[in-house]
Swiss-Prot record:
Native source species: Buchnera aphidicola subsp. Acyrthosiphon pisum (strain APS) (Acyrthosiphon pisum symbiotic bacterium)
Cellular component GO terms, alphabetical: small ribosomal subunit
Molecular function as annotated in GO: rRNA binding; structural constituent of ribosome; tRNA binding
PANTHER family from the UniProt entry: 30S RIBOSOMAL PROTEIN S12 FAMILY MEMBER (PTHR11652)
Name this polypeptide is given: Small ribosomal subunit protein uS12
């Protein structure tokens, strides 16, 4: 236990928690414009062509975001919404694109887990 004198000389320091998604600031999502849409390969031992895009956010940040789901309609200058959430096998990709909002369409023919891919409930 520190004495009052010791605390006067050197106060207790709070731990600073570093954000995993600095480009979002304190927001849950941010809007941005696609500057480049491309595919990239994951780290070992995985193998695929993962769809990603560079996004210029409204706050000036430029980040790489992952496009989840099968097929997409994004191209350069598409306006999209991004959320936090990294992709473990793609280094530097710390954001996901929100499907079914703004210019990004939902996943076609999706029947299960629809809310994560921006798909409305199908008609009976």
């Amino acid at each position: 236990m520190a004495t009052v004198n010791q605390l006067v000389r050197k106060p207790r320091v709070r731990k600073v928690i570093k954000s995993n998604v600095p480009a979002l600031g304190k927001s849950p999502q941010k809007r941005g414009v696609c500057t480049r849409v491309y595919t990239t390969t994951p780290k070992k031992p995985n193998s695929a062509l993962r769809k990603v895009c560079r996004v210029r956010l409204t706050n000036g940040f430029e980040v790489t975001a992952y496009i989840g789901g099968e097929g997409h309609n994004l191209q350069e200058h598409s306006v999209i919404l991004i959320r936090g959430g990294r992709v473990k096998d793609l280094p530097g990709v710390r954001y996901h694109i929100v499907r079914g909002s703004l210019d990004c369409a939902g996943v076609k023919e999706r029947k299960q887990g629809r809310s994560k891919y921006g798909v409305k409930k199908p008609k009976k």
